[in-house]
Every structure is written in structure tokens, then in C-alpha cells.
């Protein structure tokens, strides 16, 4: 059981890194050099929303990257628009610019292509549904475990 548990944890990490590689290769194919794969996923997680940096951090999983630094970079390169929050002038909100929305559309097209290829290999993607159930169960376990510690 211990070996299966450890293998699952390592596989989750490898899959995340592999997906970042997939995103990076798409950015390279599109000759986009002013943004990296993690920043692209930050944009994807923002989507059509307007968020504070704190909300963005809570929504995504960026493997310890500095979300504030990445947001500054994305604003400087025209992917995000940053505005003061109307209710609290100390807080800022970010939303995608037209350039950011265009990149998110390109990433969504990549994801659609991936889904199509996966569906050809295993029609219905039922194996992913089962995998997701297992991952949600593991996430709940770790969340409950951490809440018991504090």
C-alpha cells in the first residue's frame, strides 16, 4: 500500500510537470517568447473573471511560484489589466486584456486537441472520470488531514 501511495504522489507531480512541458511546447510553436508556461496557466485560471492576487493564489496551484511577480510580468507584457478594487483602494484586481484572452483561446484549442486525441485512444474518457474521483478523494484526505493538525 505504501508503495502505491508514493507512486501516486510522484505520478501527480510528474503529470503536472509534463503538462507544463506541453504548454511550453505550444508557446514555442506559436513563437511566444514573452510569457512562460506557468504564466499561461495563471491566465487560463483567471479566464473571464476579475480577481485579486489572493483569490488567484487560492484558485490555482503554481508549485511555489511567486504569483505576485508573475502578475507584474503579465501586466508589463500586456496580458493582464490591473485596476484598483472599487471597495478597497489598497487592493488591486486583475483581468485578461485582449492579448491575454487571445492566448487563453489558443491554450483552450490545444486542450480541445488533446481531448480529441485522448478520446480516439479511449472513447468516452471514462478512465479520466475514475481518475478524477480518485484524485478528489486524495485531495479531501489531505485537506482533512491538514485541518486536524491545526
Where are these regions (language model features)?
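N-terminal helix-turn-helix DNA-binding core of bacterial DNA-binding proteins
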Residues: 22-63
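C-terminal regulatory/oligomerization modules of transcriptional regulators
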Residues: 1, 125-150
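Charged, amphipathic alpha-helical coiled-coil/dimerization segments
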Residues: 72-133
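N-terminal leader segment of winged-helix/HTH proteins
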Residues: 1-33
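Generic structural concept
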Residues: 13-16, 43, 47-50, 97, ...
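Short amphipathic alpha-helical segments with heptad-repeat character
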Residues: 6-9, 13, 17, 61, ...
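N-terminal positioning helix adjacent to the helix-turn-helix/winged-helix DNA-binding module
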Residues: 4, 37-39, 99, 127
Amino acid at each position: 500500500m505504501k508503495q502505491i501511495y508514493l507512486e501516486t504522489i510522484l505520478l501527480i507531480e510528474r503529470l503536472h510537470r509534463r503538462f507544463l512541458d506541453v504548454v511550453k511546447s505550444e508557446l514555442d510553436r506559436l513563437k511566444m517568447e514573452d510569457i512562460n508556461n506557468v504564466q499561461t496557466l495563471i491566465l487560463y485560471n483567471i479566464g473571464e473573471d476579475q480577481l485579486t492576487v489572493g483569490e488567484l493564489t487560492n484558485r490555482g496551484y503554481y508549485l511555489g511560484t511567486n504569483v505576485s511577480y508573475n502578475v507584474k510580468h503579465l501586466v508589463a507584457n500586456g496580458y493582464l489589466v490591473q485596476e484598483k478594487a472599487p471597495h478597497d483602494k489598497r487592493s488591486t484586481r486583475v483581468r485578461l486584456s485582449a492579448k491575454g484572452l487571445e492566448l487563453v483561446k489558443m491554450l483552450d484549442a490545444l486542450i480541445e486537441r488533446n481531448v480529441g486525441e485522448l478520446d480516439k485512444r479511449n472513447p468516452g474518457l471514462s478512465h479520466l472520470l475514475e481518475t478524477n474521483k480518485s484524485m478528489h478523494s486524495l485531495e479531501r484526505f489531505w485537506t482533512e488531514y491538514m485541518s486536524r493538525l491545526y
